[in-house]
């Protein structure tokens, strides 16, 4: 299967690392903004074609699908472009930064009949899969999720510490992970959702601190704290408080409430959530089925984000 990866930055390269471990998939073209860095990344991964034009990449012989790891503000437009070209698409989280654009992506997916998937990685991290499997088996019920998403980003840098050409967003990007995961793990949509935000950064023009509270009909609650001001370990730290144990998840690692590490061997074929996410995308294409984290399945998360956005009076997007 020949695919296009759009985005030569930190996250695009995470996808390229994962795809390199998946048999039967070849990256036919890499799309990037800065052509010098795009050329270098293409050479590093042995990709035969690179370009700054998504349409040119999609037109390469045999291309069936595209993975978009481009700036958030480009996701909706590029996603529609890929689908209207008759190609399957996986869009990194968030698929859009408005509910209207997310709804449009789903409408275009239904119209074209291609597969459309969001890069909701937390559904695929072995740590969260372990919890989900126990929930599905009736062995566990989430009572509360306590989550902290922390970075130190007072300048516009990406996950690799390089200058970023776009501005990240606590609500529409980082909160999207936890909002979706909370609703996925409880199997319900939040009926109570409130958010507050701290001051805007004078240059970045986005909130640097945010707090979110959610509740689903079965009574489970979620407390989410987010910050770009935290001078410490970065990433998202999840505490699952359940009826039958407490669990601490950090990316692909899991421990119990007393910090005893849990062996995740056998949960999935890899310990890399990005790779597992991409495996699901390619499997759905081959098997002609709806993927986990399809545009339809993630729309409830986008609706909750829209509710939270309105609760804060419409948080500015850079």
Protein language model features and the residues they cover:
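Rossmann-fold dehydrogenase core element
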Residues: 104-121, 140-145
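N-terminal Rossmann-like dinucleotide-binding module
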Residues: 1-45
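Active-site loop of classical SDR/Rossmann-like NAD(P)-dependent oxidoreductases
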Residues: 33, 267-279, 293
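Hydrophobic residues in well-ordered beta-strands that form the structural core
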Residues: 51, 91, 116-118, 249
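Predominantly a Rossmann-like dinucleotide-binding segment in NAD(P)-dependent oxidoreductases
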Residues: 122-196, 201-202
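Contiguous beta-strand/loop segments that form the cofactor/metal-binding neighborhood of enzyme cores
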Residues: 173, 179-253, 279-289
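Beta-loop-alpha module in the N-terminal Rossmann-like domain of NAD(P)-dependent dehydrogenases
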Residues: 45-108
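C-terminal helix-rich "cap/oligomerization" subdomain common to oxidoreductases
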Residues: 65-68, 217, 281-318
């Amino acid at each position: 299967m020949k695919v296009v990866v759009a985005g030569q930055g930190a996250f695009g390269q995470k996808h390229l690392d994962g795809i390199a471990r998946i048999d039967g998939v070849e990256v036919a073209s890499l799309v990037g903004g800065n052509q010098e860095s795009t050329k270098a990344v293409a050479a590093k991964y042995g990709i035969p074609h690179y370009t700054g034009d998504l349409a040119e990449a999609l037109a390469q012989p045999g291309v069936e699908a595209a993975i978009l790891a481009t700036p958030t503000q480009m996701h909706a437009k590029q996603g529609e472009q890929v689908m209207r070209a008759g190609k399957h698409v996986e869009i990194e989280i968030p698929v859009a930064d408005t509910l209207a654009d997310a709804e449009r992506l789903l409408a275009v997916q239904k119209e074209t009949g291609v597969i459309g998937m969001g890069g909701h990685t937390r559904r695929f991290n072995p740590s969260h899969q372990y919890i989900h499997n126990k929930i599905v088996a009736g062995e566990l019920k989430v009572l509360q999720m306590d989550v902290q998403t922390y970075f130190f980003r007072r300048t516009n840098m990406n996950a690799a510490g390089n200058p970023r050409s776009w501005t990240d967003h606590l609500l529409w990007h980082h909160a999207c992970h936890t909002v979706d995961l909370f609703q996925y793990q409880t199997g319900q949509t939040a009926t109570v959702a409130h958010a507050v935000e701290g001051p805007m950064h004078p240059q970045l023009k986005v909130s640097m601190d945010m707090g979110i509270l959610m509740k689903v009909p079965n009574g489970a609650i979620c407390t989410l704290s987010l910050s770009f001001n935290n001078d410490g370990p970065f990433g998202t730290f999840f505490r699952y408080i359940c009826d039958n144990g407490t669990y601490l998840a950090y990316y692909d690692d899991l421990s119990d409430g007393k910090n005893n590490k849990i062996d995740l061997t056998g949960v999935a074929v890899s310990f890399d959530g990005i790779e597992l996410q991409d495996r699901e995308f390619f499997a759905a294409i081959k098997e002609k089925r709806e993927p986990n984290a399809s545009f339809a399945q993630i729309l409830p998360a986008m609706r909750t984000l829209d509710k939270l956005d309105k609760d804060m009076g419409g948080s500015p997007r850079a």
